[in-house]
């Protein structure tokens, strides 16, 4: 059985509202289109004003938000609360970027920026919006993690660290909200073709970090994630984790079966 995106209350239809960050393209945009088809009122969070206007023209409610800016997150949260009349059903924390390069080339400021966008911003936004969810006894909080939240590889230590943090945070939040009716899920994509690579910061341009060949062969489009996102939002029993792509499944199995040194050799290439 699934939840419907609308409820009948006192003779009126109330549309359930969800906020999606990182909505300008890729996983965020595809998920927004699908949840809109499912009947949700989608608040589409974007970092650039032009993208906010584009979301409005597509039938969404555009919200300007930069997760790297605490002030922007606060303003966006206030706007979402006002737009939903303090009644929000779901949050899809999807925005983020990758800081790639050997750890020896990454400064403290760069590491802080990686965590600010991928982790601290999602924490701040979720905590600001929880009061608009808790009184209603139901809801969904969905996080875009990554296969890099399960493993780390050379050149991706900063990005993986931010996703490891997101995994631990989501596990704790899920247990803390266990009696609230709000369910917490993690989406764990492997290699996905999106504009994410446009937002990758390379710390050594002469030695760029590239997708290994085996990952490139199993890269899927963002639509591969959409079914998982839909299930997380409308199923009465959403999963705690949704692995996406063969690469993620393989990593989960190999981590359980192989000694750490063997995994290191595989991941080092």
UniProtKB/Swiss-Prot annotation:
Annotated substrate binding sites: 146
Q: What is its EC number?
A: 1.-.-.-
Q: Which residues bind NADP(+)?
A: 15-41
For this entry, list what GO says about its biological process.
steroid metabolic process
Entry annotated with the keyword Oxidoreductase: yes
Cross-referenced SMART domains, in alphabetical order? PKS_KR
**SUPFAM superfamilies in UniProt:** NAD(P)-binding Rossmann-fold domains (SSF51735)
Which PROSITE patterns does this one have?
A: ADH_SHORT
Q: Any idea which residues are catalytic in this one? A: 159
**UniProt GO molecular function:** alcohol dehydrogenase (NADP+) activity; oxidoreductase activity
Write the record's keywords in alphabetical order, separated by commas.
Oxidoreductase
Question: Which top class of enzyme applies to this chain?
Answer: oxidoreductase
The UniProt family comment states: Belongs to the short-chain dehydrogenases/reductases (SDR) family.
Name of the protein described by the UniProt record: Uncharacterized oxidoreductase YbbO
Organism whose genome encodes this protein: Escherichia coli (strain K12)
Classification from the root reads: Bacteria, Pseudomonadati, Pseudomonadota, Gammaproteobacteria, Enterobacterales
Q: Which gene encodes it?
A: ybbO
